[in-house]
């Protein structure tokens, strides 16, 4: 397969799950995984790609158990937002150590820790070649970090939301449970809904669909996969309004 000489995308929103930062650990952040991800983002910056990043918080906080024990959902979601800020701080530090200029913006004010989210400033920073990490989700409870990724992607006019996961695309069934599950190279928004394929929560997915924001699902744990996606090689599963034949 021939490699495209130029990147397929100019500006992207990279969504990473908090769990991806755990590596083989059961909790927290694996420094080796963090540094590898920072190096992969650095490769994109060196290619001239404008990179926005949203990271989940599931490696540091999971509210389901506490919610079942009676914790208020709003309180739990606020704690989850703070977990994404912690991951964002770690990623910003890893990027700085890799000599990549990065800015951390939070949807909730955290004076002295990171900048407040500002749409116009974020776009200006991206144009100047800085990586912008968007933390604290949307700043609202009841909204997932997938929703935050789609929202920020739409706001910064990214060409695609890249969703880094533990699997290398979208399958007909859970490949962890059924080894005969079929992987899709490309699928439409309508097919995802019709076949009830698991990509992200419905609110996030319909936001992307309504604003014609393509989503590309790939395995962030696979070395080099992110670069292959950016160069337009066959990697992961592309979701958009219509298939290109």
UniProtKB/Swiss-Prot annotation:
Query: EC number(s) in its UniProt entry?
Result: 2.7.4.22
Indicate where this protein resides in the cell: Cytoplasm
Question: Can you quote a single GO CC term?
Answer: cytosol
- What is the regulatory mechanism acting on its activity? Allosterically activated by GTP. Inhibited by UTP.
UniProt GO MF annotations: ATP binding; UMP kinase activity
Put simply, this protein is called Uridylate kinase
- Secretion signal span: none
The source organism is Shewanella baltica (strain OS155 / ATCC BAA-1091)
Record keyword Kinase present: yes
Function comment: Catalyzes the reversible phosphorylation of UMP to UDP.
Give the gene name: pyrH
Please state the pathway this protein functions in, per its UniProt record: Pyrimidine metabolism; CTP biosynthesis via de novo pathway; UDP from UMP (UMPK route): step 1/1
Q: Where does UMP bind?
A: 57, 77, 138-145
Q: Which InterPro entries match?
A: AceGlu_kinase-like_sf, Asp/Glu/Uridylate_kinase, Uridylate_kinase, Uridylate_kinase_bac
Provide the residue positions that the database annotates as binding ATP. Answer: 15-18, 58, 62, 165, 171, 174
């Amino acid at each position: 397969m021939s490699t495209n000489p130029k990147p397929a995308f100019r500006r992207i929103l990279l969504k990473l799950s908090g769990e991806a930062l755990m590596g083989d650990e059961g909790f927290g952040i694996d420094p080796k995984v963090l540094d590898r991800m920072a190096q992969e983002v650095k490769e994109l910056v060196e290619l001239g790609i404008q990179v926005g990043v949203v990271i989940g918080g599931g490696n540091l906080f999971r509210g389901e158990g506490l919610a079942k024990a009676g914790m208020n959902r709003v309180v739990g979601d606020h704690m989850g937002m703070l977990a994404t800020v912690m991951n964002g701080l770690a990623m910003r530090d890893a990027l700085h150590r890799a000599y990549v200029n990065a800015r951390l913006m939070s949807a909730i004010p955290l004076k002295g820790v990171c900048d407040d989210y500002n749409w116009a400033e974020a776009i200006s920073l991206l144009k100047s070649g800085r990586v912008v990490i968007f933390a604290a989700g949307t700043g609202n409870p009841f909204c997932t970090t997938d929703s935050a990724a789609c929202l920020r992607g739409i706001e910064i006019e990214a060409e695609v939301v890249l969703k880094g996961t533990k699997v290398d695309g979208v399958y007909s069934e859970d490949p962890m449970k059924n080894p005969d599950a079929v992987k899709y190279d490309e699928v439409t928004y309508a097919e995802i809904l019709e076949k009830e394929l698991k990509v992200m929560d419905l609110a996030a997915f319909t936001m992307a669909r309504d604003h014609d924001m393509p989503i590309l699902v790939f395995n962030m744990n696979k070395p080099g996969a992110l670069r292959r996606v950016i160069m337009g090689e066959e990697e992961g599963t592309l979701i958009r309004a219509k298939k290109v034949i």
